[in-house]
Amino acid sequence: MAAAAPASTGSKGVVRQVIGPVLDVEFPAGKLPKILNALRIEGTNTAGEAIGLTAEVQQLLGDHRVRAVAMSGTDGLVRGMEALDTGSPIAVPVGEATLGRIFNVLGEPVDEQGPVNTNVTSPIHREAPKLTELETKPKVFETGIKVIDLLAPYRQGGKIGLFGGAGVGKTVLIQELINNIAKEHGGVSVFGGVGERTREGNDLYEEFKESGVINADDLSKSKVALCYGQMNEPPGARMRVGLSALTMAEHFRDVNKQDVLLFVDNIFRFVQAGSEVSALLGRMPSAVGYQPTLGTDVGALQERVASTLEGSITSIQAVYVPADDLTDPAPATTFAHLDATTVLNRALASKGIYPAVDPLDSTSTMLQPAVVGDEHYRTARAVQSTLQRYKELQDIIAILGLDELSEDDRQTVDRARKIEKFLSQPFFVAEIFTGMPGKYVKLEDTISGFNQILAGDLDSLPEQSFYLVGNIDEVKAKAEKIAAESK
């Protein structure tokens, strides 16, 4: 059906039907647009107001008609309006000019900071890198955050799922990662806000400015580009904004040859938007009402996130699990692509342990001796088994008290509490709230520190000296300070 109709840039069609965000457009014979081409519709509505929108071709229906999904509201659109085939997919601006700016799905700035200072654009649809271009040797991506680097290390060019409810520190963790990749790896970040609250998008922008991740005085010194398609926008925008953000990240990786962090909040909303569009396009729904192309849609996005020989995109994706059902097709399909999971725990946050990353629930495919080495692996497993034993003993402690435990168990509890405290650390981006300077801890320092706790070398130091510090030398210095103050 499609082969007989070659694309013609600039060909004009007529809107024949509008059903919500889906439009049917009729073109002259032989001048049908290609699938995924952008159509531009401009005109005046019945009230005489100018309207303009972009739609993406999704289906060729026959009878010289195509079906397209609108990227903005279709209010005021009427049959008979003219639609122009742009001849290419949606393209967004890329490069340094995007840093510190907020874009919508079409790459238009929405932050009232004027036009973007670049003519370089890139289409949002492209193939994933070929296998010959990929860096296949697994490499750990050092974040400088102890609990992540030791217990659930990130893979360079991998995908990480970030799980956590409201108010447990997701945003602060994201900001710290953006800060650390800029300082330690010379890399940049792209944040894709997919179908989340507009208020959260604004809060994040303000927090980025406050913490210095976005430099409001000199945008060129900013470390992140933002691309938003919030939950009040049509499903077409929410379905494609993840690809817009990914395209910006790919330019930094492929052209600038940088290491890039891509944040997607929330990957579930991407699937949800695809499900809405699928139903509107008349496709038969599959399990739980999701689109029949669920695996293809998620795979097309995830496979473009990769580490090449030139640079890498490491993606951290917030995953909403509907009704906490991990077997739901949307999170289940996403899990198949993840290399690591970072689970934030409210109980840890309430204890004041920040980052509140759960050391027992967070996992990584990188935590194996062949990748991280024997010493790292043994240390991580010993830390986890000590914390697990402490967790098992907590009921006994709550009922009978510490005194009823055996000598060995008391020692385990003592070390586990020190480990738990040592897993916390002050963040650079939180300096303005805490008054504590942030710490970036090298992986070897992290391993060495935990080994000393496990070996009992630091049993004599007070528990409080392990709280919110960087490496083990700072623990010793803090212990001396506490001892001096208590005299």
From Swiss-Prot:
Record-linked InterPro entries: AAA+_ATPase (IPR003593), ATP-synt_VA_C (IPR055190), ATP_synth_F1_bsu (IPR005722), ATPase_a/bsu_AS (IPR020003), ATPase_alpha/beta_chains (IPR050053), ATPase_F1/V1/A1_a/bsu_N (IPR004100), ATPase_F1/V1/A1_a/bsu_N_sf (IPR036121), ATPase_F1/V1/A1_a/bsu_nucl-bd (IPR000194)
SMART domains: AAA (SM00382)
Matches recorded under PROSITE patterns: ATPASE_ALPHA_BETA
Localization of this protein: Cellular thylakoid membrane
Topological category with respect to the lipid bilayer: Peripheral membrane protein
A molecular function (GO) term: ATP binding
EC number in record: 7.1.2.2
List of residues binding ATP: 164-171
Reaction it catalyzes: ATP + H2O + 4 H(+)(in) = ADP + phosphate + 5 H(+)(out)
CDD domains, alphabetized: ATP-synt_F1_beta_C (cd18110), ATP-synt_F1_beta_N (cd18115), F1-ATPase_beta_CD (cd01133)
One GO cellular component term: plasma membrane-derived thylakoid membrane
Any single Pfam family the record assigns to this protein: ATP-synt_ab_N
Keywords per UniProt: ATP synthesis, ATP-binding, CF(1), Hydrogen ion transport, Ion transport, Membrane, Nucleotide-binding, Thylakoid, Translocase, Transport
Family: Belongs to the ATPase alpha/beta chains family.
Record NCBIfam families: atpD
Assembly mode: F-type ATPases have 2 components, CF(1) - the catalytic core - and CF(0) - the membrane proton channel. CF(1) has five subunits: alpha(3), beta(3), gamma(1), delta(1), epsilon(1). CF(0) has four main subunits: a(1), b(1), b'(1) and c(9-12).
Function: Produces ATP from ADP in the presence of a proton gradient across the membrane. The catalytic sites are hosted primarily by the beta subunits.
The name this protein goes by in its record: ATP synthase subunit beta
Species of provenance: Synechococcus sp. (strain CC9311)
